[in-house]
């Protein structure tokens, strides 16, 4: 027993000694070597490996800059981005180097996992900050057959062993580098592959391209891709291909050369027509017009975009799509965090709880009738709303239409995600009807009834119309703030001080942010003088309203001595019985405030608001700020400051959405009305969303858009006409609810002699001023339903 125990101990000891010896001989030298060499690093974000030069032969300069436009994970998942993966040669000409070539270099070239060079004629300008390769012995003549072949020879001679794939592209194509990389990584570059959109020629060219039955070529416009093996086989024979050409089409001849010497031709695949997109629209103008299309999303290359602004437009759209995808990914991560926290018993952060709540129409539970979020009914063209202040039916504006198109497109992409494996495809036909609402806490919600076409292409082929209900939500992502310019605290404090209202106290705190002046500095800041506002009031009759307006003007402008000028555009017609009293009232105010800038300007003829404002504005120069006002309004000093801030000469016009009072006899049910005109409730009034008469505009911009249509008589239409002119002139319109202006209720009298359009608008305006829908309904029920009890449960149920 003792001998057996000693043998066991000796065996264990011998094993330990042998283990240490083997470790010292095998493991330690390897660890020392790794320590000397240092850790292997992944490619840097700019695409250059440690020790690798940024520039390559051929004139490329800084091709790795801007590679951070797309995330590193945008390639095939799990595969590091290889900057020596793809070489793109762009055919251009000297006359396009400053335009198309620069646009391509600044947009899609940054997404290519490799190198991009622009090939032009001999003697081309190489001082342009893009990688230009002037091809020796090549000119810019069209068709560019020699240029195309010599570019391929250049690729072969300089880069054959450095890149796996080679692409011939036009300068008016757009390439999605991340999508292209994912596609090419699924293929073997060691095999002879010739990729692009398969072409046979136009109907008129059939039989004239020297193509045998079954032969084809890759169309040059959307781009042509060659594997390294194809380029290796055909490049040595380029001279022979140049001498033996049968057509003037360079893409046909390149395809012929590849087929003859590489032994392959353009792949026969319907999918290539979608991946390499060519715009076949009738009357095409050289650019891709409709970006909100599934074709645009599926494509890898898009052609043509001959005008550089449209290239930048397309790139901006692609970046916005990428941002949307990243935002959606963040929402998914927040949801995963919330889900995992339930299993790990960890505390959920407030942000995760807000953004990670799963999709549901019950995310918000209303506790009162007023909190219920109502749905808007929609069809393909119109929105129907029961919201106070909104018309019962209105056409969809461009933003709403665009949003709906994007939603439908995303739905169809989800439905057809596995269409190939299922042997069917579903096409969208139209929206039968739907519902829409916006939850301010969580996002937009839709219920859509869709008419679709079910197309089965496996087994028994069939096409069947089907209807499907889609319940959709667009969740809000995290709020972000972006400062386009660095904040100047001193300038901001000065702008706040211009306002004599309650906000001026804020500037005292902001001044603490301003850098201290050096000792002995003589600099003294002077507050800029605020811009004078010229208030124009067309007036005919309405003396009582004029008295109230002048009382508000005195309190708001005259007593604080604000920098404004009041111009009363007084009509001299016999139909104005109050003319003498109005002139007398203005005289009294001028005596009381001799330094105030006030003027009465006579206007002849029958009343025309357009004519009066045109006459009044003619008194000012182009730098004057005009405020088109009415006598039945009251406004505050804060509004005047916003009038200045929201109106920019040559750029922006302010069309405030003002609050209009309901009839106080209905609102207060015969009781004494409140003296506070600025009470904003659903019961007291509504926002005039479709009124454009109250305007802040510079005289120069008024002249630029063509001024008022003085042929319009009476009230109405002149404001809509001016608004349309502003939009058509390309000026920005600023629209927002304005709490500093209130339209005081007064009886509306519609003259039957008005133009039919004006008369209809007048009747609509009159009907909207009686009271809110809920209050009018309650009044009707009180008179016609004896069982109705205001405020009771029965009444509440009936009016909800």
UniProtKB/Swiss-Prot annotation:
Divalent metal cations. Highest activities are measured with Co(2+), Mn(2+) and Cd(2+). A divalent metal cation binds at residues 632, 746. It is a single-pass type II membrane protein. Its cofactor is Co(2+); Mn(2+); Cd(2+). Glycans are attached at residues 188, 622. GO terms for molecular function: glucuronosyl-N-acetylgalactosaminyl-proteoglycan 4-beta-N-acetylgalactosaminyltransferase activity; glycosyltransferase activity; metal ion binding; N-acetylgalactosaminyl-proteoglycan 3-beta-glucuronosyltransferase activity. One of its GO terms (cellular component) is extracellular region. The chain crosses the membrane at residues 8-28. Residues 1-7 are cytoplasmic. This is Chondroitin sulfate synthase 1. It comes from Mus musculus.
């Amino acid at each position: 027993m003792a001998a057996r125990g000693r043998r066991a101990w000796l065996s264990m000891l011998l094993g330990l000694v042998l283990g240490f010896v083997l470790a010292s001989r095998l493991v330690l030298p390897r660890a020392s070597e790794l320590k000397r060499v240092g850790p292997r690093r992944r490619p840097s974000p700019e695409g250059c490996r440690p020790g690798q030069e940024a520039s390559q032969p051929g004139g490329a300069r800084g091709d790795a800059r801007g590679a951070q436009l797309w995330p590193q994970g945008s390639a095939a998942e799990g595969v590091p981005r290889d900057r020596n993966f793809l070489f793109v040669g762009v055919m251009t000409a000297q006359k396009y180097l400053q335009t198309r070539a620069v646009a391509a270099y600044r947009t899609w070239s940054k997404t290519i996992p490799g190198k991009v060079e622009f090939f032009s004629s001999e003697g081309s300008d190489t001082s342009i900050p893009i990688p230009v390769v002037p091809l020796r012995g090549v000119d810019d003549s069209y068709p560019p057959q020699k240029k195309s072949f010599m570019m391929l020879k250049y690729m072969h001679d300089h880069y054959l062993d450095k890149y796996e794939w080679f692409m011939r592209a036009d300068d008016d194509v757009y390439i999605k580098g991340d999508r292209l990389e994912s596609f090419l990584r699924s293929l073997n570059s060691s095999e002879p592959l010739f990729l692009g959109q398969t072409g046979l020629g136009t109907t008129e060219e059939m039989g004239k391209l020297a193509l045998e039955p079954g032969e084809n070529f890759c169309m040059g416009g959307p781009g042509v891709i060659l594997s390294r093996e194809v380029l290796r086989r055909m490049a040595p024979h380029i001279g022979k291909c140049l001498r033996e050409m049968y057509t003037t089409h360079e893409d046909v001849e390149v395809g012929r050369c590849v087929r003859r010497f590489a032994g392959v031709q353009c792949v026969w695949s319907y999918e290539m027509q979608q991946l390499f997109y060519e715009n076949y629209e009738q009357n095409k103008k050289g650019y891709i017009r409709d970006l909100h299309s599934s074709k645009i999303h599926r494509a890898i290359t898009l052609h043509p975009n001959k005008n550089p602004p449209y290239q930048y437009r397309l790139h901006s759209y692609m970046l916005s799509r990428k941002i949307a995808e990243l935002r959606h990914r963040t929402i998914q991560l927040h949801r995963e965090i919330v889900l995992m926290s339930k299993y790990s018993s960890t505390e959920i952060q407030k942000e995760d709880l807000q953004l990670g709540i799963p999709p549901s129409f019950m995310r918000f539970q209303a506790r009162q009738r007023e909190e219920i979020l109502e749905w808007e009914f929609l069809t393909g063209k119109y929105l129907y709303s029961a919201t106070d202040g909104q018309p019962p039916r209105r056409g969809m504006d461009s933003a709403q239409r665009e949003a709906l198109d994007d939603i439908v497109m995303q739905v169809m992409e989800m439905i057809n995600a596995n269409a190939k494996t299922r042997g069917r495809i579903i096409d969208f036909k139209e929206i039968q009807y739907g519902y829409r609402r916006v939850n301010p806490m969580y996002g937009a919600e839709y219920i859509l009834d869709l008419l679709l076409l079910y197309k089965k292409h496996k087994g028994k082929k069939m096409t069947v119309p089907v209807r499907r209900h889609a319940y959709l939500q667009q969740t809000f992502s995290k709020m972000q703030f972006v400062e386009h310019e660095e904040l100047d605290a001193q300038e901001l404090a000065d702008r706040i001080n211009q306002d004599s209202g309650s906000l001026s106290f804020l500037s005292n705190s902001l001044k603490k942010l301003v850098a201290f002046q050096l000792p002995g500095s003589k600099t003294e800041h002077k507050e800029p003088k605020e811009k004078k506002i010229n208030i124009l009031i067309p007036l005919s009759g309405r003396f009582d309203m004029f008295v109230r307006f002048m009382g508000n003007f005195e309190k708001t402008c005259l007593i604080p001595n604000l920098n404004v000028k009041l111009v009363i555009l007084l009509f001299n017609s016999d139909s104005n019985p109050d003319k003498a009293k109005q002139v007398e009232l203005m005289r009294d105010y001028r005596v009381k405030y001799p330094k105030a800038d006030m003027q009465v300007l006579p206007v002849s003829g029958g009343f025309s608001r357009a004519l009066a404002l045109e006459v009044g504005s003619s008194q000012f120069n182009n730098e004057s700020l005009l405020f088109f006002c009415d006598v039945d309004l009251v406004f505050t000093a804060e509004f005047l400051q916003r009038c200045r801030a929201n109106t920019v000469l040559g750029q922006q016009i302010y069309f405030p959405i003002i609050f209009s009072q309901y009839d106080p006899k209905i609102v207060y049910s015969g009781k004494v009305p409140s003296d506070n005109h600025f009470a904003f409730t659903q019961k007291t009034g509504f926002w005039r969303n479709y009124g454009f008469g109250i305007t802040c505009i510079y005289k120069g911009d008024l002249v630029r858009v063509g001024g008022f249509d003085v042929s319009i008589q009476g009230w109405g239409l002149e404001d809509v006409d001016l608004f349309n002119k502003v939009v058509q002139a390309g000026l920005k319109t600023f629209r927002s609810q304005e709490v500093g202006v209130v339209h005081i209720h007064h009886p509306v009298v519609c003259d039957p002699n008005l133009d039919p359009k004006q008369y209809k608008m007048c009747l609509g305006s009159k009907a909207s001023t009686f009271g809110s829908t809920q209050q009018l309904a309650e009044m009707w029920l009180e008179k016609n339903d004896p069982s109705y009890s205001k405020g009771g449960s029965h009444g509440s149920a009936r009016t909800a």
